[in-house]
Every structure is written in structure tokens, then in C-alpha cells.
């Protein structure tokens, strides 16, 4: 019941953030946008206890059990989660106020759920959903902390160094389509071990005259490499933006796990 109340609150916040700007524009003709700070301030403080109750809730009989009956293994896992989270947050210089509690409780849920998979009489649909949710929060946190970005103006033949990589702007291929012209840039991302080729596009449409950019993304199990380039006024120069976004694929996997848990739960009720 507690988890359901939290979920209703989170969904209400998202609904308000989506619908409120539309209503305001209709009523007052005033345009506003609701960004991440709104969601951070409302959701994160409630997300921390939500993760905690997801971890311990399935193992506690709320009416019969007392706090003293909380499993000692849970306390040990909680301490391990604190230590790992503190080391990580301290190493990467992340804000302690909200990041540390989020890391602690998402790790706690992650470890508890893995342990419970090997227990007796487990609710498999519930565990899959809880594991997926903990993986989702951890992946988002790690993505936010470890993501890297570099932007610079480059010409064909230029190369720049970013972290341990070299970004090489090799050439541009111009192709004429039916109603637009496309500029395909060829970039090589070189590091010590391998080379990655990315080919983002700039599309110049005829009527009306519009310029759009199409990013090229290379996905691996650990990170996505994202590159996009745009035309700027300086002759021969293009603005090139390269991003490394860790654990993006795990965000999608976690969403699939949450959905799978929900489907299994519905099938179980219908049996």
C-alpha cells in the first residue's frame, strides 16, 4: 500500500508538470516550461524512503513484526551500501545532500533484491520489478555523474583531444535528395585500444528553408557515444558536440524488467 501511494504521488507530479504549462497557455496565453529542477525538488526527497520501503517491505509483516525483527542481513547490506556509496560520491565529487542518500538506498534495494531471488517462496514478478527499479535509479545516477561532453568548432582535417580520446574530423560528403541536401560528416574517435567511426548529418531542406541536425549514436553495453555537428557562420567551421553517456542501455533494460514484472503479476492474478 505504501509503495502504491508513492507511485501515485510520482505520477501526479509528472502529470502536473506535463499538463500545467498547456492549461496556462490556453487560459492566459502565457508560455512556460517545467524543467528538471521542478521534478528534482518534488520527487527526489520522496524517492529515498520509497526505495527503502521497496527493499524491506516485502520481508516484513507490517502488523505483526516490530522494528527489532528486521533481518540482520538487511542491516549488513545497508552498511555495505553506505560504504560503497560514500566511496563513489567522494571519488567523483558529487553533491552529498541528495546524491549520497539516493546511491545508498538504490544500492540497498539492488542488493536486497538479488539476495531475495535465492530465497524461498519469492514473488518473482515483484522481485523482477523491484530489481528493475533499483537498476533504473542506479543507471540514471551513474549516467548523470559519469557523463562527459565536449563542444568545439572544427574544420575538415582538424583533430582535438578529449580525455583519453582524439576526435578526428575526416571529411564531408554532400548528397542531394528529393527535397533536401544532406551533409554527412565522417568522424573518427580514436583511443588507445580502438577506433570508432561516427557519421552525423546536417540536412538543409528547400521549402521552407530549414536546417536540421541528425546525430549519430554508437551504443555499447557500458556507454553510448553521441556526436552531432552544426553549421556556423565562420567559413568552413562546424560546431561539433561529442558526448559519452554511460549505462544508457541499462536504463532501457531496467524499464523492460519493470514492465516484465508488471505483466507477470497480471498473468498471475488472472490464473
Q: Where in this protein do the model-derived segments appear?
A:
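Contiguous transmembrane helix-bundle modules in multi-pass membrane proteins
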Residues: 1-162, 167, 249-271
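Accessory, solvent-exposed terminal regions and/or long lumenal/extracellular loops of proteins
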Residues: 134-270
Amino acid at each position: 500500500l505504501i509503495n502504491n501511494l508513492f507511485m501515485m504521488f510520482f505520477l501526479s507530479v509528472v502529470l502536473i508538470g506535463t499538463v500545467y504549462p498547456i492549461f496556462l497557455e490556453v487560459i492566459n496565453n502565457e508560455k512556460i516550461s517545467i524543467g528538471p529542477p521542478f521534478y528534482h525538488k518534488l520527487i527526489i526527497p520522496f524517492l529515498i524512503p520509497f526505495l527503502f520501503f521497496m527493499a524491506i517491505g516485502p520481508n516484513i509483516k507490517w502488523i505483526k513484526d516490530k522494528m527489532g525483527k528486521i533481518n540482520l542481513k538487511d542491516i549488513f547490506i545497508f552498511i555495505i551500501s553506505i560504504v560503497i556509496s560514500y566511496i563513489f560520491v567522494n571519488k567523483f565529487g558529487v553533491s552529498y545532500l541528495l546524491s549520497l542518500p539516493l546511491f545508498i538506498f538504490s544500492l540497498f534495494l539492488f542488493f536486497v533484491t538479488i539476495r531475495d531471488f535465492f530465497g524461498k517462496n519469492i514473488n518473482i514478478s515483484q522481485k523482477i520489478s523491484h530489481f528493475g527499479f533499483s537498476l533504473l535509479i542506479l543507471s540514471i545516477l551513474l549516467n548523470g555523474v559519469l557523463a562527459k561532453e565536449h563542444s568545439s568548432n572544427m574544420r575538415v582535417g582538424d583533430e582535438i583531444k578529449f580525455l583519453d580520446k582524439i576526435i578526428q574530423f575526416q571529411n564531408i560528403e554532400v548528397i542531394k535528395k528529393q527535397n533536401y541536401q544532406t551533409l554527412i560528416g565522417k568522424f573518427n574517435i580514436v583511443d588507445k585500444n580502438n577506433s570508432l567511426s561516427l557519421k552525423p548529418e546536417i540536412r538543409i531542406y528547400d521549402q521552407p528553408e530549414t536546417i536540421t541536425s541528425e546525430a549519430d549514436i554508437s551504443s555499447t553495453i557500458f556507454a553510448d557515444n553521441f556526436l552531432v555537428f552544426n553549421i556556423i557562420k565562420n567559413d568552413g567551421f562546424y560546431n561539433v558536440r561529442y558526448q559519452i553517456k554511460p549505462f544508457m542501455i541499462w536504463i532501457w533494460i531496467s524499464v523492460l524488467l519493470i514492465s516484465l514484472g508488471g505483466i507477470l503479476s497480471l498473468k498471475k492474478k488472472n490464473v
